[in-house]
A protein has these predicted regions:
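N-terminal subdomain of nucleotide-sugar transferases
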Residues: 1-63, 109
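Acceptor-binding helix/loop patch of EC 2.4 sugar-transfer enzymes
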Residues: 8, 72-89, 134-157
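Short, solvent-exposed loop/turn segments at secondary-structure junctions
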Residues: 10-11, 42-44, 66-68, 119-122, ...
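Short, flexible loop segments at the rims of nucleotide/cofactor-binding pockets, characterized by
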Residues: 12-15, 89-94, 111, 157
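Membrane-proximal helix-turn-helix segments that form the acceptor-binding/catalytic region
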Residues: 25, 100-104, 141, 156-157
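Short, conserved loop/helix-junction motifs that constitute active-site signature segments
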Residues: 29-30, 126-129
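A conserved catalytic-core segment of Leloir-type glycosyltransferases
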Residues: 40-104, 108
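Short N-terminal targeting/anchoring amphipathic segment
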Residues: 102-121, 132-134
Length: 157
């Protein structure tokens, strides 16, 4: 069976919670499925880690996205996003090149199921609306924000 695996990051190196979870889910799924991995990288340095997930995948495609924080690329994206309906986090990962590659995989491969590793990748759902898909999330973001709000003293944050 063929599985399209969408991830906001390359899970390697396995050095934190997000990477741990994604890496081991990918590794476990690879025992049963042929994996077509599409991921994103904030930094050129991250591309050098693609060989570490290739043993689990038929194909690995990584696409650059704007790095989070105060840098020209992310600020430009944030400014443009003021005039968009979708949240910044979703727009950030929705790129024409990734869209084309996903369409190509879907056209050329008989994909049985799609694994969407984070809600931020939800804008791609229209490309595979006729396929079964699983959306996972790593955290309960509303709970994290609530806890942060209870402890933050600065009202401007």
């Amino acid at each position: 069976m063929n599985l399209l695996f969408l991830s906001t990051e390359n899970p390697y190196p396995v050095d934190g919670g997000h990477h741990l979870r994604t890496f081991y889910v990918l590794k476990l799924l690879a025992k049963r499925y042929k994996i077509y991995f599409v991921g994103f990288a904030q930094d050129k340095e991250e591309f050098k880690y693609t060989p570490f997930i290739k043993p689990f995948c038929v194909s690995v495609d990584m696409f650059p996205v704007a790095k989070t924080g105060f840098n020209p690329g992310f600020l430009w994206l944030g400014g443009k996003n003021l005039f968009q309906k979708q949240p910044l986090i979703a727009r950030r990962y929705f790129t024409p090149r990734a869209c084309s590659r996903i369409e190509e995989i879907l056209r050329d491969t008989d994909i049985d199921i799609v694994h969407v590793d984070m809600l931020a990748l939800g804008m791609y759902a229209r490309l595979f609306s006729d396929l079964p898909a699983i959306l996972t999330n790593h955290n309960v973001e509303s709970l994290r924000l609530f806890r942060w709000l209870k402890h933050e003293k600065n009202p401007l944050k």
